[in-house]
Amino acid sequence: MTQADELRRLAAVLRAEARPDLTYMEVCGTHTMSIARYGLRELLPDSMRLVSGPGCPVCVTAMADLDRVVALARLPQVTLATFGDLIRVPASRTTLAAERAAGADVRVVYSARDAVQIAADEPAREVVFAGIGFETTAPTIAASLLEARARGLANFSVLSMHKTMPSPLKALLELGETSISGFLLPGHVSVITGTACYEFLARDYGVAGVVAGFEPHDVLRALLRLVRQTTPAIEIEYGRAVRPEGNVVARRLMEQVFAPSDADWRGLGVIPGSGLALRPEYAESDALLRFPLELEPPLEPAGCRCGEVLRGVTDPADCALFGARCTPEDPVGACMVSSEGACAARYRYRGLDD
């Protein structure tokens, strides 16, 4: 059976078994892109709606945090290293790309270890790694920080803007803006966290969840699992990579370096305990403490509905800026910049994902 045949078969089963008025939310940016790329919405029954959630790390980074990154990049002694997606995300008044063009030392790296090596190669520079992401990337950044300390690289520091995934799901359910029937839970994050952290969804809110892989058949199979649940529960579809216990070693490494902290999420505001701050014993490597900055109040772009898209209450195409004033080439909001953003996915695959 070809992949196309399998997708048609799964879609037919979904159409036959789906109940009325189902709304499922995917909370992983890679799922968002896969759903758009393969036009999966077109295969779903009319009674089923898929909405995007707060699963894109760049997208959920608050404007105030982006402004801090820009301010750090402007310091003459600082080399600002970060992942490529962050370069073009609009802060209140500029972007890292614009600052680099104006002379700031901003470098794209593929891992935090690359930033550690820059610090080793250029001891006269203060190398700051701007870290974003969820539990997927936090352990690798923790390992890089420990490596820098072991190598005696006092010129390396981390600005941690990391967030933890289960927290925004609770915030969304508490808000109650969208009636969510179930969640497509993130595969990469769950490799690290396991599934125990999601149990509250079914226990406290009566909302089901299935950890899904990223191939189109993974997504449809996960949706079918959600449809077939008679009692809300947390299941794993992505069994080839995810175990209920997760990656204990990676979590211990993360917990050695980071501690829970309050974090500001685009579209959701401050969620207590949803961030990852460096522990006090790593204060000398904490760019937030090492480079105290006075920042102007953040400015949100007029008309941008990225925050609503991240909460699942607005479809990207319903934003007046979408595809006109806001495009991947000239983005207004973060959801149009990131490769995992809902607006970027919808724009790139428009026609397939309408």
Predicted regions span which residues?
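Metallocofactor- and cofactor-centric catalytic cores in central/energy metabolism, strongly enriched
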Residues: 1-124, 138, 150-151, 159, ...
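Glycine-rich beta-alpha junction loops
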Residues: 28-31, 134-136, 162-166, 187-191, ...
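Short hydrophobic/aromatic-enriched beta-strand-loop microsegments
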Residues: 49-52, 106, 151-158, 181-183, ...
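A generic structural motif
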Residues: 50-57, 156-163, 210-217, 237-240
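Short, surface-exposed amphipathic charged segments that create phosphate/polyanion-binding patches used
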Residues: 65-68, 120-127, 171-175, 198-200, ...
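Active-site histidine-anchored catalytic micro-motif
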Residues: 121-131, 136-186
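A conserved active-site cap/scaffold subdomain adjacent to cofactor or substrate pockets
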Residues: 177-242
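Internal helical hairpin/lid segments
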Residues: 220-308
